[in-house]
Amino acid sequence: MAVLVAQIVAASVLIASLHARLPTPHEAATEHRTIHTVSLGSSRTDVLLHRVRADLGDSVSAVERFWGTDWTREITVVATGTLAQFGTEAHLDPRRQWGDIAAVAVADQVDLAGRVASGQRIVLAPGAADMSDSALRIVVTHELFHLAARTGTALDAPRWLTEGVADFVARPPAPVPRTARADTALPTDADLDQPGPQRSTGYDRAWWFARFVADAYGVDGLRRLYTRACGPGHADLGTAVREALGVDSVELQSRWAAWLTG
């Protein structure tokens, strides 16, 4: 699985000032949205962006089915040719390891009160060019959800839940492996911090939790939980669970454990 991270940054960086190649607008494969692409590599990243444009309609549709249509009409995708470019464009901490990250959704500025975000873009790592079409679609859809939900997501939202819901939107259902039964605790942000297998498992567990909520309480229940637990001015998780799902955290965890082991 390609692991994804969403990050918001405070300072605006103009891509055009750093690179001679300016974004070229293309009409996306959906009625009311436009995709702008920036290739920072060579023919390799050009081909990657062509694949993204050709398949973007399905990603937009998946996000709209879950989140609705009231989000930005402008979609910018940047394809990087080196890990150094990826780190720069995605504003990643150079002291941390990002080799297992396929893409990042970033914004230069976010006004949650006004529900406005500027400088939003999806930045693809060099390894994205080697992905299959289905894997690339998952990556782009995952990051597109973060872009769509940006102004409805607090800076201190529980990352594991934002990532799990993004994977729910992006990934097709698949059987939960028997090994998942070994850990029935709720996911945590710490699960996503360690590079390698632990981070991959953390994303899987967050995804399974989102699937569980959708199975047990409906897709509308999952969306309500995201809004209550991750939205601006959100409650703590226990309160959000009661408000969105009508159960307490103890009952939720019990049902989650039964879902994993059932």
Walk through the language-model features, giving the residues of each.
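Hydrophobic membrane-insertion alpha-helices, especially the h-region
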Residues: 1-17
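Charged, low-complexity, helix-prone segments enriched in Lys/Glu/Asp/Gln
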Residues: 4, 49, 60, 252-260
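N-terminal hydrophobic targeting segments that direct proteins to the cell envelope
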Residues: 15-30
